[in-house]
């Protein structure tokens, strides 16, 4: 008698933050899968758009976990991952609509080879004919991400499975045994690069990360943050620097990375530069914890001198970013223009021009020079005092801007701590209600 091996158990974690507009299509697509998930959990990060109420009313088969606050992508998913016991877990964004065979294809991918720890999808832009993601890669020395196939018309040119550096967390399948070995998502990433990080850790542990083209979906990619916005740039580059400091070799960070970053920084517009400055400040403030995370997740420890070099390099980048906010030659030009100088008399009349100019000069010496020179001296003194005062105001403004930037970083850090505390309180209340019930 032929024995049929059942497919591995598979669950879906759907992390949501104010994604109500996308949930209906996303959940209907999950309900229509050829291989349904054994469990679908909506993890809500404190939405205020009625997401939880909508799902509870219209999709009662979805298990709901309300975190009570926006604790980020990694921490939010980890809440569900700690409870999950399925052999395969699919992390999914609300703005992704899976094709009917997507979960079956992801299950097939991990069944193909026990060394495959993570599998990702072929994701298309709305319309279904343009590729958004067919596996990812990072450029060196700055850890800028790229996507295979992005912007290409899907003509099955990326139709073969392949090992890649990373797949994006909008729709990725993770083997449970991998998480048991390397740990959960790094909660130091609030948003962005947490998927790249866990793929790097998986490959370091000897697992494969694969792009699996049979697993397909539409990624609307607009539910979380507007690309190019100040908040996006700040979060993206904070996470980018956390990633490269966790995983890049010390000699690359201290040399090519800092050098390339400085040149890249000079090309940014003022708004982008301000956002990146905050990312640098947050990174520098978090360096002690990042070095701990680097060793915890299997990276080579950085010796103290290398850590000091990175710290010094970050200070240099911050200073470079801030200096570009002011035109250093502006006050110099103003000071030069503010000096009044006596102009000689000139006449362009042929033959007698020099005589006329000499007469005017002589008359000026007798009639008005004594008075005009006095006024010029007064005006020059006033102009010098004005420029000096402006220099003082500029220095004070620079100082206030630096304090404001540091306060913004501290405020963001404090807000995240408060959100995590709210999530802990919500979880304690849930446990108390469960025991009392």
Which residues make up each language-model segment?
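Short, acidic, metal-binding catalytic loop of nucleotide-sugar glycosyltransferases
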Residues: 28-37
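Short beta-strand/loop segment that forms part of the nucleotide-sugar
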Residues: 38-46, 65-67
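Conserved donor nucleotide-binding strand/loop of the catalytic core
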Residues: 52-83
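Acidic/His-rich active-site region of diverse nucleotide-sugar glycosyltransferases
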Residues: 69, 75, 79-82, 97-98, ...
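Short aromatic/hydrophobic "clamp" motif used to bind/position activated sugar donors
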Residues: 89
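Active-site-adjacent helix/loop segment of glycosyltransferases
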Residues: 124, 204-288
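Short active-site alpha-helical segment characteristic of glycosyltransferases
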Residues: 195-201, 217
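Terminal low-complexity segments of carbohydrate-biosynthetic enzymes
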Residues: 238-239, 260-347, 351, 386-389, ...
